């Protein structure tokens, strides 16, 4: 992984400068999601980077874990900016959009507090449970809340997963790569 600092297209080749060195390619697929940077301004304007954060509790007793999720299933609510949660290793893993800013030291700490409140709203029996871990990442939302796949200036892209990238990015990555090989993709 290396951040792209400059991107140019000359004739039929792309010249890409990264923090780790230069790359040349005949075609490229941009799948940067919330990390789409200044080097690709036309795509950066298509999405809004938003933080997504997760907390993990201390290990819970078998009895409490069963009480919270008898079938140990992944759960999410139906809010527009949803929360999602499940048990793993007898820990409650609880995530959501606690802050609309990309992750940094301040947003991670504040997000842990917000997610803890949300977790206790859903599971009041966790009010005295300690939070062992918190982390975050940056995802992207398109202005129309839809995933966008297409080609701009000869670059193929897939962006705007709105928190569904784990499932959709794998599928669309394969689909776009196949379309690139055939040369037939339009937004």
Predicted regions and their residues:
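C-terminal lid/capping helical subdomain adjacent to the catalytic/cofactor pocket in oxidative enzymes
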Residues: 152-187
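Short beta-strand segments that buttress and anchor functional surface loops
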Residues: 16-18, 160-161
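Conserved ATP-binding module of the ATP-grasp superfamily
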Residues: 1
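Active-site substrate-recognition segment that forms the wall
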Residues: 4, 14, 21-62, 66-153
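Flavin (FAD/FMN) cofactor-binding and adjacent substrate-gating region
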Residues: 11
């Amino acid at each position: 992984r290396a951040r792209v600092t400059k991107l140019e297209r000359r004739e039929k080749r792309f010249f890409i400068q990264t923090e780790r060195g230069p790359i040349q390619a005949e075609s490229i697929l941009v799948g940067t999601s919330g990390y789409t940077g200044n080097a690709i301004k036309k795509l950066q304007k298509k999405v809004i980077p938003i933080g997504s954060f997760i907390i993990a509790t201390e290990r819970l007793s078998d009895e409490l874990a069963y009480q919270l999720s008898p079938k140990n299933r992944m759960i999410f609510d139906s809010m527009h900016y949803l929360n999602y949660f499940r048990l793993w290793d007898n820990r409650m893993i609880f995530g959501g959009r606690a802050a609309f800013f990309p992750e940094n030291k301040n947003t991670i700490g504040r997000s842990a507090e917000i997610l803890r409140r949300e977790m206790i709203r859903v599971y009041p029996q966790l009010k005295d449970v300690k939070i062992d871990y918190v982390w975050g990442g940056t995802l992207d939302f398109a202005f129309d809340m839809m995933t966008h796949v297409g080609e701009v200036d000869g670059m193929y892209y897939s962006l705007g997963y709105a928190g569904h990238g784990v499932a959709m990015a794998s599928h669309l990555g394969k689909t776009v790569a196949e379309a690139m090989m055939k040369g037939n993709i339009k937004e």
